C-alpha cells in the first residue's frame, strides 16, 4: 500500500464530482443538439447531409480524445486505452441506433408520400364523379329544354296563325283609313286652294291701291320739281342782271375815283366784301345743305325719266330767247318721248300682271299635282311597309324553324356527347376501382410494415436501456480507476515537476467531467428520439387507419353512385328516344306549316302586287298629265320671257337712242353757250370801246351830285382877286373831294348790294354745276 502524501483518511465523494469545464476545444460536439425531434419529409435530405458532414466531426472528436489520452504520460496509458475502447464501442452503438432511426424516418416519409398520392387519387376520383353528376344534370336540363322548345314551337304556330288573321284585319282597316284620309286631304286641299285664291285677290286689290298712291306721290313730286325749276330759272335771271350791274359799277368806280381815294375805298370795300363773303359762304353752305336734301327727295320720288327730264329742262332755259324753235322742238320731243315711255310702261305692267297671274295658276296646278304625288307616294310607302312587315314575319318564322332545327341538332349532339361521357365515366369508374383495389393492397402492405416497425420498438427500447446501464457501469469503472490512480499517485514519491502532475490531474478531471456530460446527453437524446419515433409511428398508424376507413367509405359511395348512374343512363336513353321521336314529328309539322305559310304568303303577295300595279298605273297616268300641263306652262312661260326680253331690248334701244340724242343736244347747247359767252364778251368789249359805259357812269354821277355842280358854278361866276388866283384851284379841289366822298358812300352801299347779289349768283352757279355733274354721272353709268 502506498502511504498518503499529505492527507489522512478516506477521499471524500465530492472529489469525484464533476467540475466546471475550463477549456472550450474539449467540449462535446454540437451535432447532437442539432438533431430535430421529428423531421418532415422535405427536410430529411438536409438532415442526412448534416449528419454526413458531422460524421468527420465525430471522428475528429475521437481523435482529439485519443490524443488527449496520450498526452498525460506513460503511467495512465493502460486505463486510458480501456476508456477509449469503451467509448468507441458506445459511439458505434449510437451510430447504429442513429442509422435505424434514419431508416425509420425514411419509411415514415415514404408512408406519408404514398398517403398523399392516395389522397390525390381519391380527390381526382371525387372530381370525376362530380363531373359525371353535372353531365347527368346537363342531360336532364337539355331534355327539359327540348320539351320546352317543342311547347314553344306549338305556341309560336298558334301565335302565327292568330297574327296572320290580325294582319288581314289590320290591312283592311288601314285600306279604309287611307281612303278616308285621302278624301279628307282632297277636301282640305280644295279649301286651302280657295283660301289662297281669296288671299291672292286681296293682295291684288292692295297692290292696286298702293300703285294708285305711288302714282299720286309721283305726280306731286313732279309738280315740286317743276316749281323748283321755275325758281331756279328766276334766280339765274336775277343773278345775271345783278352781275351786269356790278360789272358796270366797278368800271365806273375805277374810272372816276382817283388812286388814293380808290385805295382807301378799296380797302374799306375789301373789308366789307370779306365780311359779306363770310356771310355769303355761310348762306351758301346752308343753301347747299338744303339743295342736297331737295335733290335726295327728288331722286327718291322720281325715276330715271324724271332726272332726264330735269336735265333737259335745265339745259333749255326760258331766258334763251334767241332760239325759240329749238325749245319748241325739245318740248315736242320730250312730250312724244313721255307718251312713248308711258305706253311702254303700261304694256310692261300689263304683261307683268298677266305673267304673275299665269305663274300663280301654274304654281297652284304644280302644288296640287305635287300633293297628289306625295299622297300616292305615301300610300305606296305604306303598302311597301306592309309588304316588308309580312316579309319580316316570314323571315321570323323561317328563323324560328332554323332555330328549332338548330335545337334538334344540338339535342343530337348533346345525346352523342352524353353517350361519350357515359362511356368515359364507365372507363373512369373501372380505373377508380382498380386504383382503389391497388391502394387498398398498398395500405395493407404499409400497415404490415408499420406493425413490424412498432414490434421492433420494444427491442430498441431494451437496447437503449442496456446501453444506458452500460454507460453507468463504464462511468463507475472510470471513477474507480481514477480513484486508484490518484491513490497511487499520492502513495508514490512526488516527481520533481509538481506543476506537470497537477496539470495532468486537472486535465484528467476535466476529461472525466466532459465524458460524463457527453454520455448523459447522448443517453437523453437517444431516449427523446425513441419517444418521438414511437409517437410519430402511432400518429401515422392512426392517420393511415383513418385514411383506409375513408377510402372504404368512398368506395361504397362510388359503387352506389355507379348504380344510380346506370339507372339514370337507362332513363336518359329512354328520354332520348322519346325526344328523337318528338323531333321527327315536329319536323313533319314544321314542313307542313312552312308549306301552308308559303302558299298564303304567295297569295297575299300576288294580291298586293296587283293593287300596287293598279295604283302605280294611276299615278303614272296622273304624272304624265301633270308633266304635259307643266310642259305647256313652261312653253308659255318661255314665250312670255321671250316677249319680255324683246320688249326689254326695244326699251334699251330706245333709251340708248334717247341718250345719244340727249348727248348730242347737250353738246350742241354747250357749243351754243360758248358762242353766247363769246358774243357777250364781244358786246362788252365793244361797249367799253364806244364809251357807253362811261356815259352811263357820268349820268349816274350827275344825278347823284347836282348840289355839288351848283356850288361849283357859283364859285366860278363870283369875282376873284388876283391874289387868290393861285388858291382857286385848291378850293375847287376841296369841294370836289368832299362831293366824291359822299358819292363814294352811296356807291359803297350799292356795291354791298351788288356783292350780295354776286355771291348769290355764284352759289346758284355752283349748284347748277353740281347738278350737271350729278346728271352726267348717271349718264356715264348708263
UniProtKB/Swiss-Prot annotation:
InterPro entries, alphabetized: HCR (IPR009800)
Recorded superkingdom: Eukaryota
Pfam families given in the database record: HCR
Main location: cytoplasm
Coiled coil: 82-314, 344-435, 498-691
Intrachain S-S bonds: none
Residue segments, region Disordered: 62-82, 191-218
GO biological process: cell differentiation; protein export from nucleus
Intracellular or extracellular location(s): Cytoplasm; Nucleus
Comp. bias (Basic and acidic residues): 62-74, 208-218
Gene Ontology CC annotation, any one: nucleus
Keywords: Coiled coil, Cytoplasm, Developmental protein, Differentiation, Nucleus
Role according to the record: May be a regulator of keratinocyte proliferation or differentiation.
Protein name in the entry: Coiled-coil alpha-helical rod protein 1
Gene name, Swiss-Prot/TrEMBL: CCHCR1
Amino acid at each position: 500500500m502506498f502511504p498518503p502524501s499529505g492527507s489522512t483518511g478516506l477521499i471524500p465523494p465530492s472529489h469525484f464530482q464533476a467540475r466546471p469545464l475550463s477549456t472550450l476545444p474539449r467540449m462535446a460536439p454540437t451535432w447532437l443538439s442539432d438533431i430535430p425531434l421529428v423531421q418532415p419529409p422535405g427536410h430529411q435530405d438536409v438532415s442526412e447531409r448534416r449528419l454526413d458532414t458531422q460524421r468527420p466531426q465525430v471522428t475528429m472528436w475521437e481523435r482529439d480524445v485519443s490524443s488527449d489520452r496520450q498526452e498525460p504520460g506513460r503511467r495512465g496509458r493502460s486505463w486510458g486505452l480501456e476508456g477509449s475502447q469503451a467509448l468507441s464501442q458506445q459511439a458505434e452503438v449510437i451510430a447504429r441506433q442513429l442509422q435505424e432511426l434514419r431508416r425509420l424516418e425514411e419509411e415514415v416519409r415514404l408512408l406519408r408520400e404514398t398517403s398523399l398520392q392516395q389522397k390525390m387519387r381519391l380527390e381526382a376520383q371525387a372530381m370525376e364523379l362530380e363531373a359525371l353528376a353535372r353531365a347527368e344534370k346537363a342531360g336532364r336540363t337539355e331534355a327539359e329544354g327540348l320539351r320546352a322548345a317543342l311547347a314553344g314551337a306549338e305556341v309560336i304556330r298558334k301565335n302565327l296563325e292568330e297574327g296572320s288573321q290580325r294582319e288581314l284585319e289590320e290591312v283592311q282597316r288601314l285600306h279604309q283609313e287611307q281612303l278616308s284620309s285621302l278624301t279628307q286631304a282632297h277636301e282640305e286641299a280644295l279649301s286651302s286652294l280657295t283660301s289662297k285664291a281669296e288671299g291672292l285677290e286681296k293682295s291684288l286689290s292692295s297692290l292696286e291701291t298702293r300703285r294708285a298712291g305711288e302714282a299720286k306721290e309721283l305726280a306731286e313730286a313732279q309738280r315740286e320739281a317743276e316749281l323748283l325749276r321755275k325758281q331756279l330759272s328766276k334766280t339765274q335771271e336775277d343773278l345775271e342782271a345783278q352781275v351786269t350791274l356790278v360789272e358796270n359799277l366797278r368800271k365806273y368806280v375805277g374810272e372816276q375815283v382817283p388812286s388814293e381815294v380808290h385805295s382807301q375805298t378799296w380797302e374799306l370795300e375789301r373789308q366789307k366784301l370779306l365780311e359779306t363773303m363770310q356771310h355769303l359762304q355761310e348762306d351758301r353752305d346752308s343753301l347747299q345743305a338744303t339743295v342736297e336734301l331737295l335733290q335726295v327727295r327728288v331722286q327718291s320720288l322720281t325715276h330715271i325719266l324724271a332726272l332726264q327730264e330735269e336735265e333737259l329742262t335745265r339745259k333749255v332755259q326760258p331766258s334763251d330767247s334767241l332760239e325759240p324753235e329749238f325749245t319748241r322742238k325739245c318740248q315736242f320731243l320730250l312730250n312724244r318721248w313721255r307718251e312713248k315711255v308711258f305706253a311702254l310702261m303700261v304694256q310692261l305692267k300689263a304683261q307683268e300682271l298677266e305673267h304673275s297671274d299665269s305663274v300663280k295658276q301654274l304654281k297652284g296646278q304644280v302644288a296640287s299635282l305635287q300633293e297628289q304625288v306625295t299622297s300616292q307616294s305615301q300610300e305606296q310607302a305604306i303598302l311597301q311597309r306592309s309588304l316588308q312587315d309580312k316579309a319580316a314575319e316570314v323571315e321570323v318564322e323561317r328563323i324560328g324553324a332554323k332555330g328549332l332545327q338548330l335545337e334538334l341538332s344540338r339535342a343530337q349532339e348533346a345525346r352523342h356527347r352524353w353517350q361519350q361521357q357515359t362511356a368515359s365515366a364507365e372507363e373512369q369508374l373501372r380505373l377508380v376501382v382498380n386504383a382503389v383495389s391497388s391502394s387498398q393492397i398498398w395500405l395493407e402492405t404499409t400497415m404490415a410494415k408499420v406493425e413490424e416497425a412498432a414490434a421492433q420498438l420494444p427491442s430498441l427500447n431494451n437496447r437503449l436501456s442496456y446501453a444506458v446501464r452500460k454507460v453507468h457501469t463504464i462511468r463507475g469503472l472510470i471513477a474507480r480507476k481514477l480513484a486508484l490512480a490518484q491513490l497511487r499517485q499520492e502513495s508514490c514519491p512526488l516527481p520533481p515537476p509538481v506543476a506537470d502532475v497537477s496539470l495532468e490531474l486537472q486535465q484528467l478531471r476535466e476529461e472525466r467531467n466532459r465524458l460524463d456530460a457527453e454520455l448523459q446527453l447522448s443517453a437523453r437524446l437517444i431516449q427523446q428520439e425513441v419517444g418521438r419515433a414511437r409517437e410519430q409511428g402511432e400518429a401515422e398508424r392512426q392517420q393511415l387507419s383513418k385514411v383506409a376507413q375513408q377510402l372504404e367509405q368512398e368506395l361504397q359511395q362510388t359503387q352506389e353512385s355507379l348504380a344510380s348512374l346506370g339507372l339514370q343512363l337507362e332513363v336518359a336513353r329512354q328520354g332520348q328516344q322519346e325526344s328523337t321521336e318528338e323531333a321527327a314529328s315536329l319536323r313533319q309539322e314544321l314542313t307542313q306549316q312552312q308549306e301552308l305559310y308559303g302558299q298564303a304568303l304567295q297569295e297575299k303577295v300576288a294580291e298586293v302586287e296587283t293593287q300596287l300595279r293598279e295604283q302605280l298605273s294611276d299615278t303614272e297616268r296622273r304624272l304624265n298629265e301633270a308633266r304635259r300641263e307643266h310642259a305647256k306652262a313652261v312653253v308659255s312661260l318661255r314665250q312670255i320671257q321671250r316677249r319680255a326680253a324683246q320688249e326689254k331690248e326695244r326699251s334699251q334701244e330706245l333709251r340708248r337712242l334717247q341718250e345719244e340724242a340727249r348727248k348730242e343736244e347737250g353738246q350742241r347747247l354747250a357749243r351754243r353757250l360758248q358762242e353766247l359767252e363769246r358774243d357777250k364778251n364781244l358786246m362788252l368789249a365793244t361797249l367799253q370801246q364806244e364809251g357807253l359805259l362811261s356815259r352811263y357812269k357820268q349820268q349816274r354821277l350827275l344825278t347823284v351830285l347836282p348840289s355839288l355842280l351848283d356850288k361849283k358854278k357859283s364859285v366860278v361866276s363870283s369875282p376873284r382877286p388876283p391874289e387868290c388866283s393861285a388858291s382857286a384851284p385848291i378850293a375847287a379841289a376841296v369841294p370836289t373831294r368832299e362831293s366824291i366822298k359822299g358819292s363814294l358812300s352811296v356807291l359803297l352801299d350799292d356795291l354791298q348790294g351788288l356783292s350780295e347779289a354776286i355771291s348769290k349768283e355764284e352759289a346758284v352757279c355752283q349748284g347748277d354745276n353740281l347738278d350737271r355733274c350729278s346728271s352726267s354721272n348717271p349718264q356715264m353709268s348708263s
